[in-house]
UniProtKB/Swiss-Prot annotation:
This is Dual specificity protein phosphatase 8. Residues 23-138 form the Rhodanese domain. One of its GO terms (biological process) is dephosphorylation. Keywords: Cytoplasm, Hydrolase, Nucleus, Protein phosphatase. It comes from Homo sapiens (Human). It holds the Pfam family Rhodanese. Residues 380-389, 555-570 have a biased composition (Basic and acidic residues). InterPro entries: Dual-sp_phosphatase_cat-dom (IPR000340), DUSP8_DSP (IPR048035), MKP (IPR008343), Prot-tyrosine_phosphatase-like (IPR029021), Rhodanese-like_dom (IPR001763), Rhodanese-like_dom_sf (IPR036873), Tyr_Pase_AS (IPR016130), Tyr_Pase_dom (IPR000387). Its main location: cytoplasm.
Length: 625
């Protein structure tokens, strides 16, 4: 057994190093330390058998073999038939004879003796070997320090004074009370960031400052930062060195040093922390002070934003540039309804007036910025055209309107600025549907037309603000009762009873008389002849694209003649009792869009305008029996 083989073989670090340098075929090196220690640093090409209590108990009970404990990469060496030398090491064992019988290393050695012919223990363990031959050790690289502000301090017991800047030192109470050390470094100013640390006897009161705070999570260090920075700058102006210290030089004094770097070097709190940490790795401000450093960083950014341009005094807004004498004021775009009041106020404060009046008192910075922004507002011609292309909508309720003495020359294009419209023609039940009467905007409007109370008047032509959507409603009830129903067939639905005809059976005409559905080769278009067939017309009738020209009027006359035929030849519907009920409620809703027309043509150019327009419409005719 292994316990009978005494004394046990040993191997020193030099011999193991020579064997490892010999290349492949060397001894099997077993690391008996914990997995954490092995993973951090271990001998080159060694394998680990973790020294846990569970592994120790299972080895003692014989429930696990050495081959099962060794990593798969080195298992081939264990299972080899050729003789294999084994070297075992722990952390620092120098003499195997002093090992306890129940120790993990003793149990492991006894089990290895049963599997291998030559088992030796490394003298001095890994500590001796790594110090003599660090190049023959390997492991994962040391983890980088976390880059956050809350990284822990390194275990440096005593680092002494640390020079952060040529005139700034960081230290502890022990360093400050060492007069020789202070004199050697030429330090004559002391900033004490504690309540309990005494003042050095060799430092005068004028060169000593105390920040009475404790290192806990309730102290407020932020109010003292500016005073501390002024004290450090005072020492710098005197060409002297200053030391900032607390009890250990880790938390409170380090916070003040970080704040000084932030203020003087323009660094962020994170960068300033790393700057000081690189020079004194033991610093570790508590989270309370770290949070106050973040608040101090925000205050510095706010101060820099308020100061703005270095050439402009802080707190004094730069006055807006005033135009030269006799020079015209910059033209402002037409104010909208939302900015009219603001624009007027800005215009009153915009500098010298044309009469040479003195400028108004300086306005607050926000008002000056608003005035400059308003002066720079300009709308391009494309934006103006896009504004004019917005849809407008209005509705007309028409019973009948006819003015024989008034005859327009022809329908013309809409007024400038009045772009594509949404038209809705709606007549109540029992009223005749005819051509719409001129709108109040048209010069041919009938004088007897009376607007409905809810109609919104059109804004004056000179008004700069115009709503993109207009609503208009007209009621011609009185005109319908005073004027005859003649010449209203231009927009009447085909097949309806003509003027002056009694309603007979089958008053509704078949849909074959209706205008054809618009198609690519026969789209909707305007009909000038139909427009001239009635008085007081605002909108031209619509027909097929093949109809414009002289043929359009002849088609309408043929439809009039067809409607003039006796109605008794048609059967199917009972006769209407009264002329007032001949025409029933009909609705027509049309929506069309058209581009802006540069040259406003009249009369003969209407057909070309209709071809340029894109039209979509729907007609619904309801006959109530």
């Amino acid at each position: 057994m292994a316990g009978d083989r005494l004394p046990r073989k040993v191997m020193d670090a030099k011999k193991l190093a020579s064997l490892l340098r010999g290349g492949p075929g060397g001894p099997l090196v077993i690391d008996s330390r914990s997995f954490v220690e092995y993973n951090s640093w271990h001998v080159l090409s060694s394998v680990n058998i973790c020294c846990s209590k569970l592994v120790k108990r299972r080895l003692q009970q014989g429930k696990v073999t050495i081959a099962e404990l060794i990593q798969p990469a080195a298992r081939s060496q264990v299972e080899a038939t050729e003789p294999q030398d084994v070297v075992v090491y722990d952390q620092s064992t120098r003499d195997a004879s002093v090992l306890a019988a129940d120790s993990f290393l003793s149990i492991l050695l006894s089990k290895l003796d049963g599997c291998f012919d030559s088992v030796a223990i490394l003298t001095g363990g890994f500590a001796t070997f790594s110090s003599c031959f660090p190049g023959l050790c390997e492991g994962k690289p040391a983890a980088l320090l976390p880059m956050s502000l809350s990284q822990p301090c390194l275990p440096v017991p005593s680092v002494g004074l640390t020079r952060i800047l040529p005139h700034l030192y960081l230290g502890s109470q022990k360093d400050v009370l060492n007069k020789d050390l202070m004199t050697q470094n030429g330090i004559s100013y002391v900033l004490n960031a504690s309540n309990s640390c005494p003042k050095p006897d060799f430092i005068c009161e004028s060169r000593f400052m105390r920040v009475p705070i404790n290192d806990n999570y309730c102290e407020k260090l932020l109010p003292w930062l500016d005073k501390s920075i002024e004290f450090i700058d005072k020492a710098k102006l005197s060409s002297c060195q200053v030391i900032v210290h607390c009890l250990a030089g880790i938390s409170r004094s380090a916070t003040i040093a970080i704040a000084y770097i932030m203020k003087t070097m323009g660094m962020s709190s994170d960068d300033a922390y790393r700057f000081v940490k690189d020079r004194r790795p033991s610093i570790s401000p508590n989270f309370n002070f770290l949070g106050q450093l973040l608040e101090y960083e925000r205050s510095l950014k706010l101060l820099a934003a308020l100061q703005g341009d270095p050439g402009t005094p802080s707190g004094t807004p730069e006055p807006p540039p005033s135009p030269a004498a006799g020079a015209p004021l910059p033209r402002l775009p037409p104010p909208t309804s939302e900015s009219a009041a603001t624009g007027n106020a800005a215009a009153r404060e915009g500098g010298l007036s044309a009469g040479g009046e003195p400028p108004a008192p300086p306005t607050p910075p926000a008002t000056s910025a608003l005035q400059q922004g308003l002066r720079g507002l300009h709308l391009s011609s494309d934006r103006l055209q896009d504004t004019n292309r917005l849809k407008r909508s209005f509705s007309l309720d028409i019973k009948s309107a006819y003015a024989p003495s008034r005859r327009p020359d022809g329908p013309g294009p809409p007024d400038p600025g009045e772009a594509p419209k949404l038209c809705k023609l709606d007549s109540p039940s029992g009223a005749a549907l005819g051509l719409s009467s001129p709108s109040p905007d048209s010069p041919d409007a009938a004088p007897e037309a009376r607007p409905r109370p809810r109609r919104r008047p059109r804004p004056p032509a000179g008004s700069p603000a115009r709503s993109p959507a207009h609503s208009l409603g007209l009621n011609f009830g009185d005109a319908a009762r005073q004027t005859p129903r003649h010449g209203l067939s231009a927009l009447s639905a085909p097949g309806l009873p003509g003027p002056g005809q009694p309603a007979g059976p089958g008053a509704w005409a078949p849909p074959l008389d209706s205008p054809g559905t618009p198609s690519p080769d026969g789209p909707w278009c305007f009909s000038p002849e139909g427009a001239q067939g009635a008085g007081g017309v605002l909108f031209a009738p619509f027909g097929r694209a093949g109809a414009p020209g002289p043929g359009g009027g002849s088609d309408l006359r043929r439809r009039e003649a067809a409607r003039a035929e006796p109605r008794d030849a048609r059967t199917g519907w009972p006769e209407e009792p009264a002329p007032e009920t001949q025409f029933k409620r009909r609705s027509c809703q049309m929506e069309f869009e058209e581009g802006m027309v540069e040259g406003r043509a009249r009369g003969e150019e209407l057909a070309a305008l209709g071809k340029q327009a894109s039209f979509s419409g729907s007609v619904e005719v309801i006959e109530v029996s």
